């Protein structure tokens, strides 16, 4: 019996992670159903990542890596790059990195250039010569962004003042909690409901007397987030601690906000002066 239904995707994953004998078979079907599903590309990427994290056979790993290419997802490109060092998965991984990177000039950076050069050196299939030429052409056309790096470092002054770097542009090592919804993308931390998960992100380390510096931008109307302080994990920071609003309050859905709900307010406690936002995408 073969069932073609999105409803079988999660049960297959549960079988794969609870039954070692059926893991490969279940994950192979899990990948096929995910690929054919109505999920958005971000959700599909999350499923392929979960399949890889379950450590299946090389064949299933290669199927997941190949499937990631169709998501055209930045995180997928970076995840696939990690599999280029394993000879058994190198070809599938290299092809996926190439198929994503060369279709997205906006992803290009010094780090992505290095990845593409590694892809060029890794590819060995019948079309490798043509693929290398495509990579060379892409790199040549995007020289203007070669100096752009996704890596962030503390300045000498910040180090002297005792600041700690919580996010360097590519890894989430300082964080715990909802690491599925908060993802490193092109040097910044990106969060969207389209990943299909909910919950808060927390620093692993607790801080008492601190200064937190960060920049942000909204990529769509009505974004609602916040910075929680003095809050336990696993609860609503706005009610069990303090939540400083990060809110695109110009959106029509927020027309009736009270003064202690606008951006910059400590929600329900300390009101902030309401500002007028600039265009979406402005930091």
Model-found features: residue ranges?
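Carbohydrate-interacting regions of secretory-pathway proteins
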Residues: 146-283
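Residue-level detector of extended alpha-helical repeat arrays and alpha-solenoid scaffolds
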Residues: 23, 27, 61, 77, ...
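Amphipathic alpha-helical scaffolding segments comprising HEAT/armadillo-like alpha-solenoid repeats
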Residues: 4-16, 38-52, 62, 73-84, ...
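Long beta-sheet-rich domains in secretory-pathway and surface-associated proteins
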Residues: 55, 74, 92, 122-123
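Glycine-centered coil turns and helix-coil junctions that link the paired helices
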Residues: 19, 33-37, 86, 100-104
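Short inter-helical turns and helix N-cap capping residues of alpha-solenoid HEAT/ARM repeat scaffolds
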Residues: 5, 18-20, 56-57, 85-89, ...
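Beta-propeller blade termini and top-face loops
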Residues: 22-25, 32-35, 95, 236, ...
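Core register positions within helices of long alpha-helical scaffolds
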Residues: 2-3, 29-32, 67-70, 96-99, ...
């Amino acid at each position: 019996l073969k069932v073609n239904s999105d409803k079988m995707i999660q049960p297959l994953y549960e079988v794969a992670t609870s039954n070692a004998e059926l893991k490969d078979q279940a994950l192979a079907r899990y990948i096929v159903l995910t690929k054919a599903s109505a999920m958005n590309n971000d959700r599909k990427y999350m499923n392929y990542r979960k399949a890889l994290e379950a450590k299946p056979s090389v064949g299933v790993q290669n199927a997941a890596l190949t499937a990631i290419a169709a998501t055209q997802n930045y995180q997928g490109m970076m995840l696939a790059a990690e599999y280029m060092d394993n000879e058994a998965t190198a070809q599938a991984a290299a092809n996926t990195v190439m198929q994503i990177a060369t279709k997205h000039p906006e992803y290009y950076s010094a780090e992505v250039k290095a990845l593409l050069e590694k892809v060029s050196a890794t590819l060995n299939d019948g079309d490798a010569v043509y693929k290398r030429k495509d990579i060379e052409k892409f790199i040549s056309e995007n020289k203007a962004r070669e100096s752009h790096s996704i890596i962030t470092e503390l300045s000498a002054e910040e180090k002297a003042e005792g600041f700690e770097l919580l996010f360097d542009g590519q890894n989430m090592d300082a964080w715990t909690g909802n690491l599925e919804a908060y993802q490193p993308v092109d040097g910044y931390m990106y969060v969207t409901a389209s990943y299909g998960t909910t919950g808060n992100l927390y620093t692993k380390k607790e801080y008492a007397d601190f200064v937190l510096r960060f920049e942000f931008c909204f990529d769509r109307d009505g974004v609602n987030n916040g910075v929680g302080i003095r809050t336990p994990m696993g609860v609503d920071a706005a009610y069990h601690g303090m939540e400083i609003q990060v809110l695109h309050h110009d959106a029509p859905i927020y027309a009736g906000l009270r003064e202690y709900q606008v951006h910059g307010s400590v929600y329900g406690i300390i009101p902030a002066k309401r500002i007028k936002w600039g265009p979406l995408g402005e930091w």
